[in-house]
């Protein structure tokens, strides 16, 4: 397929399947933008765009650690995911035991506390936390949020786990209390809900992708029972919901932005507060089957990723079109507002030569 990519974003095509079993041609587009030096300015296109992520990338051993970056090749996303990976910085570089971090995009916002390293201490019949260790900079994510698997008893074949976040820290079962001293607490807490017990049900606080088995995501994944195996496989179950493709919880999903929005980062960079605007999120895309227009839309990003350590924002767009015969029927794709010569050549039924075109 020939691609005319005027903005120079990264792009790749793949295939997806809907619940009815219909195959779709999917184009995924990703552009990266640098945080501006001037407060309130618009983020500018990066010299080098962040590569598309082909498969989920974990912070450690896959399946036993949190997701750092989730694949860019989801089929569809009804909402826009807001994702942050980075670290907390103490205000003015002064070591602190607790720092509130936050992000605001348009009218949406989320904030929580990042806390210094602590340990559980068993004191007679009770369990207490040590004082937080002061920090200037501290990374955080779901592998340091509340949760985890209680492996204090090596002979337990089915150790208890905090299923909302089995990759986290701080959770334990009461039956292993005697071995709890020295075990780490989470590095993040919900504002107004400090972690004071390993046995309570706390909300894991982070800004990255959630694991695919989390209840509020898994419930959209569909039912894979014997009836599905006998009568539906290899297609999706009828109760599969495309909200499963959202890589963050509902508290980090926003409507797909159709205009530039204000962004504010709190204590996620050394400066303490960063304020800038999203670049124009509207992206015209046109797909062709030979001379037939298969799709002519203005699309909006369904994923915003803030890599605060790199001072970079990435936006991801996607569009899908049902396949009539085969994936090779799609012959041309225009990304961005096309040049006049390209439009005139298409209308005249002629080929258009451009150094910007790629196969």
Predicted features by range, described:
Residues 2-359:
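Extended intrinsically disordered or low-complexity segments
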């Amino acid at each position: 397929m020939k691609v005319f990519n005027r903005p120079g974003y990264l792009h790749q095509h793949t295939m997806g399947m809907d619940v009815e079993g219909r195959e779709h041609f999917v184009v995924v587009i990703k552009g990266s933008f640098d945080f501006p030096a001037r407060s309130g300015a618009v983020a500018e296109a990066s010299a080098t765009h962040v590569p598309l992520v082909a498969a989920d990338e974990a912070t450690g051993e896959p399946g036993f650690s949190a997701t750092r970056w989730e694949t860019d090749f989801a089929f569809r996303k009804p909402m826009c995911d807001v994702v942050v990976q980075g670290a907390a910085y103490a205000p003015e570089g002064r070591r602190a035991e607790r720092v509130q971090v936050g992000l605001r995009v348009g009218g949406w916002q989320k904030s929580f506390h990042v806390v210094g390293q602590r340990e559980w201490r068993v004191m007679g019949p009770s369990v207490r936390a040590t004082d937080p260790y002061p920090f200037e900079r501290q990374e955080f994510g779901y592998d340091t949020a509340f949760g985890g698997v209680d492996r204090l008893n090596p002979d337990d074949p089915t150790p208890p786990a905090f299923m909302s976040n089995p990759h986290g820290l701080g959770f334990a079962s009461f039956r292993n209390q005697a071995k709890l001293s020295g075990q780490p607490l989470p590095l993040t807490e919900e504002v107004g809900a400090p972690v004071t017990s390993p046995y309570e049900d706390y909300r894991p606080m982070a800004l990255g992708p959630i694991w695919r088995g989390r209840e509020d995501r898994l419930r959209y994944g569909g039912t894979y029972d014997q009836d599905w195996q006998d009568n539906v496989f290899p297609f999706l179950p009828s109760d599969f919901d495309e909200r499963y493709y959202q890589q963050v919880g509902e508290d980090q999903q926003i409507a797909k932005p159709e205009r530039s929005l204000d962004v504010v980062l709190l204590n996620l960079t050394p400066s303490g507060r960063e304020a800038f605007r999203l670049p124009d999120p509207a992206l015209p895309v046109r797909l062709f089957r030979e001379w037939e227009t298969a799709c002519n839309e203005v699309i909006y990003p369904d994923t915003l990723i803030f890599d605060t350590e790199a001072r970079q924002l990435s936006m991801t767009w996607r569009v899908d079109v049902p396949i009539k015969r085969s994936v090779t029927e799609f012959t041309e794709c225009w990304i961005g507002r096309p040049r006049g010569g390209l439009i005139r050549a298409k209308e005249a039924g002629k080929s258009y030569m451009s150094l910007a075109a790629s196969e």
